[in-house]
């Protein structure tokens, strides 16, 4: 959508059977409804994976976000009960170029369209997603809304709503920067994942307290595969409650929202570090470690979201293809060890261990003097490549060494 010479919004043609996407900067895309009819607003972002759409939809880190798939053809393999990463769909809305009219996969239990409809997820299809993504890369992610069905009608007059009316709804949506969302997606009660695979039925090698800030289901499973008993605990847990679990290590998960607004979790993490527990953080957990150490965080222009992001391990020189979902990053110096800024270097030396090769964004932190490290990306690989699975082994090794030395 463009503006005319007078500066007013140029209104595209649409009717009550269409679905309309409105961006906060005034751009409008008219397509077809996909999934449920209605209205949804949130931060519009794009994901670059060719596969793994079911894992994307159920990732709690996408809370309050409208997701655009850059790959044009989505839905071929349908949906099943094995691939979700949580108990529900978390995206606020979903946009695809060309949804598959047929499902063709031996594991499929239904269609993506039906699943979105059943779960009340408002979506849109048959727009130029390439044009949309190019705009988001240029202008940055922003607030947006999808409107279809009765949401396009002014209930007072019975007429179609104007773009100005829809735009007002979009601009009344909270900005992602400044939002605290992890309590919204966290489990309310502790649950436990026992060792599995070759360790099934055996005594656990290690006990992990995993703080759920929006955890994906595959993450504790990756630890359980390595002989860990994983207590997944609510974000509201206290340090005393963590200690009562007698963990060998503590894990902070991925999650949505602005890390600057996670003050209680940052203080909890500092208590964990002060007590000498081995610590591993992923995604939001990486950002919280950064802030606990005294570094800042900032919002990326359009973020990293997809299962094909190149990351370089600066300690080995190896490049990994990794899965990402983050719109914020840690502001830390690259290429040297520095004193962690918090309380004049209380936590000793730290260095950036990984960077994204597309934009040099910090993708990992390694503490030198305390048993703590984190990565910004997703080594659990759900969906995505398994290049970074070694990080779970590193966490186990950290717990093993810490046990020998005595915490």
From Swiss-Prot:
Encoding gene per record: carA
Role this protein plays: Small subunit of the glutamine-dependent carbamoyl phosphate synthetase (CPSase). CPSase catalyzes the formation of carbamoyl phosphate from the ammonia moiety of glutamine, carbonate, and phosphate donated by ATP, constituting the first step of 2 biosynthetic pathways, one leading to arginine and/or urea and the other to pyrimidine nucleotides. The small subunit (glutamine amidotransferase) binds and cleaves glutamine to supply the large subunit with the substrate ammonia.
Pathway entry: Amino-acid biosynthesis; L-arginine biosynthesis; carbamoyl phosphate from bicarbonate: step 1/1; Pyrimidine metabolism; UMP biosynthesis via de novo pathway; (S)-dihydroorotate from bicarbonate: step 1/3
Native source species: Bifidobacterium longum subsp. infantis (strain ATCC 15697 / DSM 20088 / JCM 1222 / NCTC 11817 / S12)
CDD domains: GATase1_CPSase
Domain of life, source organism: Bacteria
Catalytic activity: hydrogencarbonate + L-glutamine + 2 ATP + H2O = carbamoyl phosphate + L-glutamate + 2 ADP + phosphate + 2 H(+)
Active site (UniProt): 283, 378, 380
GO BP, sorted A to Z: 'de novo' pyrimidine nucleobase biosynthetic process; 'de novo' UMP biosynthetic process; glutamine metabolic process; L-arginine biosynthetic process
Domain Glutamine amidotransferase type-1: 207-405
Keywords, comma-separated and alphabetical: Amino-acid biosynthesis, Arginine biosynthesis, ATP-binding, Glutamine amidotransferase, Ligase, Nucleotide-binding, Pyrimidine biosynthesis
Protein name: Carbamoyl phosphate synthase small chain
Pfam families linked to this entry: CPSase_sm_chain, GATase
Similarity section: Belongs to the CarA family.
